[in-house]
From Swiss-Prot:
PROSITE patterns given in the database record: POLYPRENYL_SYNTHASE_1
EC number: 4.2.3.-, 2.5.1.29
Protein name per Swiss-Prot or TrEMBL: Bifunctional type I diterpene synthase tndC
Domain-related comment: The conserved DDXXD motifs as well as the NSE/DTE motif are important for the catalytic activity, presumably through binding to Mg(2+).
Sites where the protein binds Mg(2+) 1: 92, 96
Motif (NSE/DTE): 224-232
Pathway field: Secondary metabolite biosynthesis; terpenoid biosynthesis
Length: 764
């Protein structure tokens, strides 16, 4: 394996206690990338979740965890892995001491599964989920497929391991080791190493890969147990437990020997795993039936073993006598750098040769005159002490919470309370009088007349009256079709800022979904579309008359729901944006039915009405009913988002295999819609008789033949229409990002979830 980002450390400068013979230690060339994001994660936890007390995580005076356990990590990925690993350490401490550890694991699992499958994490207004959304967003922006693989692996880790049996009293070594192989995070390590090194294990080799790596996973678990024994023992005592879920305790009890003797038994087991795994790696290197990436993964794990050992021997997390180095203490006291150092000049490349410009880091603290971001000051024991931060606003306009006496005074604008179940066991004693907050805000707040599926309001529950079944049927059908729920996700993301009370938020989702589904019913009928989400369109099943009647009925039903807000302004917003939807659709239909090609400006005016109207509707309702003391106009952002959303849809309709599967090949051309690529083609080739005649034939036949659609698509490529659309998407994406940044500064809160939604749309 080629080593590009790490160097071998002089063995005379570190200790191994004789437990890693034959495996050198390698250290990443830019460990400060990890340090910055590790401290940032701690600050985010203080701000979003609660105080850390005497917590210590992945930093060490000489060696940081990720820098020596994944030394060949691609530089642009080291920061986010350091951030994610710090969350893992925090989560580990939570499940050690929490009364409901499995609930926290279930929550972690659900969040990562959602991020991997939909790009959305529900309930992102809660602290932990906001942190997870940030991780997912950063990873997706680097490499979507590697990120999805890692998020799925971490979800599996949360499901099977992650301390789920910390309270189990294991009786035998074999029983415990079987559990520990899962709990050490087979899937967690797999996710870290593969994402960090840009590795893609072939699906057919995955089972074999893990089987070959089992010995390494066992080593990692045993090493962790050996050096974390004292910490876990003290935690068990503090929690009034008479046992410790650690190999040392299990050996002592099963063999009836002393602690010192049990540790020696553990050391011998560790030595054996080193010998065995070195042989496995050497044997695998010689095989020609194993992929290069599987070999790279196993060799990467080899250095994880030496790194994990050396870090464990002197890290502050396991050893109270160990402190931090000067740079770390300086950053803890005076603030971390505003931006991480540039990696490899002006850009970095991932394993696939994709270049990424260095990103400006998230501003999670106040800026001083030295381009620093203030984090809570920390003493040599890792405990926060009084800081001079006074919740001031930094250069980016983000307001941050003051820190005092080891606790985070949570920003009142967030209206979030400290969850003492998520606080280190030693700090819990100091905060036992503080009330916790709900794990999922908005849970257990069902509004009358709605059905919730995975937290998203999907349909109105009809009364038992038989007379309504007929008029309800078309709506129920369209509501039952699979949906990505982008609007629900966007509402959840905006609520990070707006803090709309749960009952009102559910009402906004219900109204939005009603209007969205009715618009789909009418659009498919008016456009002559026979497919919706890969299924038959509503009007092809229920007929045009019933579909129109049901759609109109549910517009009235939506208005009834708006009345429940109890104020006139909500009704005004509803009527204004509903009118916009109809005006936008009228322009689209007029251009299509009369074969009139609009200008680009006219097209975007139509989009702001037809697509942007629904986004503005829920955005304006959320602003009106926001409990946040800061008020901001979301209209500009939502208009830009609507433009981006529709332009992306235009492009995907012509180029995406998934769209072809769901709606048919180039369906927009069948319908005669003037999408942005077609508008560009018409205006860039006004004298092209092929284009004009094909479009005339489409009007005559009310559809375009597959051959005609293919011809139009080829002309779009030749005339640069698809490239023009891609360029437009880049510009619109930048404008949406700028709007998000402006709103983050206005509200004083980073919106990781909204950025994740935008990134998923860009990558899809």
């Amino acid at each position: 394996m080629e080593y590009r980002y790490s160097t071998v450390v002089d063995p005379s400068t570190y200790e191994t206690h004789g437990l890693c013979d034959g495996i050198p230690l390698r250290c990443h060339e830019s460990p400060e990338l990890e340090e910055i994001e590790t401290l940032r994660c701690q600050e985010d936890w203080r701000r979003w979740v609660g105080p850390l007390g005497f917590y210590k995580g992945g930093l060490g005076p000489r060696w940081n965890f990720m820098a020596i356990t994944v030394p060949e990590c691609l530089p642009e990925r080291l920061g986010v892995l350091g951030y994610a690993n710090e969350l893992a350490f925090l989560h580990d401490d939570v499940t050690d001491v929490a009364d409901y550890g499995d609930l926290h694991n279930d929550d972690l699992k659900a969040a990562f599964e959602q991020a991997a499958s939909t790009g959305h994490i529900e309930g992102s207004a809660s602290g932990k989920r906001a942190i997870q959304a940030h991780i997912a967003n950063e990873m997706m922006s680097i490499h979507k497929q590697h990120a999805i693989t890692t998020l799925e692996a971490w979800a599996k880790f949360a499901e099977l391991g992650s301390g789920r049996q910390h309270t189990t009293h294991f009786k035998t070594e074999d029983e415990y080791i079987k559990y520990r192989m899962i709990d050490i995070g087979t899937m967690f390590w797999y996710g870290m190493v593969t994402f960090g090194m840009g590795i893609s294990i072939p699906e057919h080799e995955l089972e074999m890969c893990h089987r070959l790596a089992d010995t390494a996973y066992l080593n990692l678990g045993l090493t962790n147990d050996l050096y974390s024994w004292q910490k876990e023992y003290e935690t068990a005592v503090a929690m009034d437990r008479d046992y410790v879920a650690n190999i040392i305790g299990v050996i002592m009890e099963e063999r009836n020997i002393s602690e010192a003797e049990a540790k020696e038994v553990c050391r011998e087991k560790i030595k054996k795993t080193i010998v065995d795994f070195r042989k496995i790696v050497d044997d695998t290197k010689a095989r020609d039936d194993v992929s290069l990436d599987t070999k790279r993964y196993l060799e990467g794990l080899l250095y994880s073993l030496s790194g994990n050992l050396v870090w464990s021997i002197d890290c502050p997390r396991y050893h109270p006598w160990s402190s931090y180095n000067e740079r770390q203490l300086d950053w803890m006291k005076n603030g971390i750098p505003k931006s991480p150092p540039k990696v490899n000049g002006n850009a970095t490349a991932n394993g696939n040769g994709v270049h990424h410009a260095p990103k400006e880091s998230l501003a999670n603290g106040t800026l001083n005159g030295h381009d620093r971001i203030h984090a809570p000051a920390v003493n040599g024991n890792g405990a926060s002490h009084t800081s001079s931060i006074k919740g001031s606003t930094g250069g980016n306009g983000v307001t941050h919470s003051p820190v005092s006496n080891g606790s985070a005074v949570v920003n009142s604008a967030l209206s979030m309370e400290i969850d003492t179940d998520l606080v280190n066991v030693f700090a819990r004693k100091e905060y036992k009088s503080i009330n916790g907050f709900k794990m999922h805000e908005g849970d257990n707040h069902p509004s009358n007349g709605q059905t919730k599926l995975n937290g998203n309001v999907t349909s109105w529950k009809v009364p038992g009256d038989v007379q309504t079944k007929v008029i309800q049927a078309p709506y129920d059908y369209i509501s039952s079709l699979p949906s990505k729920g982008v609007r629900d996700h966007a509402i959840d993301a905006l609520n990070v800022w707006c803090r709309v009370p749960a009952a009102k938020l559910d009402l906004i989702k219900l109204i939005t979904n009603m209007l969205h589904n009715t618009s789909l019913m009418l659009d498919d009928l008016e456009d002559g579309s026979h497919l919706r989400r890969g299924r038959s369109s509503t009007h092809t099943i229920f007929g045009a008359g019933q579909t129109v009647n049901a759609a109109n009925y549910h517009v009235i039903r939506a208005l009834e729901e708006v009345q429940k807000f109890g104020d006139a302004e909500s009704i005004v917003i509803f009527i204004e944006e509903l009118k916009s939807l109809y005006v936008g659709q009228s322009l689209d239909l007029y251009w299509t039915n009369n074969a009139i090609c609009p200008s680009v400006d006219e097209y975007f005016q139509m989009v702001e009405n037809k697509t942007g109207g629904l986004f503005r509707l829920f955005g304006r309702l959320m602003s009106l009913h926001s409990s946040h003391p800061v008020k901001a106009d979301l209209t500009g952002f939502l208009n830009q988002f609507g433009r981006y959303f529709q332009t992306r849809d235009d492009y995907q309709n012509l180029t995406s295999p998934e769209y072809t599967k769901q709606k048919g090949f180039c369906e927009d051309l069948d319908e005669g819609k003037f999408s942005l690529p077609l508008i560009h083609l018409m205006h860039s080739a006004p004298s092209n008789l092929v284009v004009r005649n094909i479009w005339t034939q489409r009007l005559v036949n009310n559809k375009a033949s597959p051959a005609h659609k293919q011809t139009i698509l080829e002309l779009m490529k030749e005339n640069g229409s698809l490239q023009f659309t891609m360029d437009a998407l880049d510009v619109l994406h930048a404008k949406v990002e700028k709007s998000i940044s402006d709103l983050e500064a206005r509200f004083g809160v980073e919106n990781f979830q909204l950025r994740l939604i935008l990134e998923m749309l860009r990558k899809a």
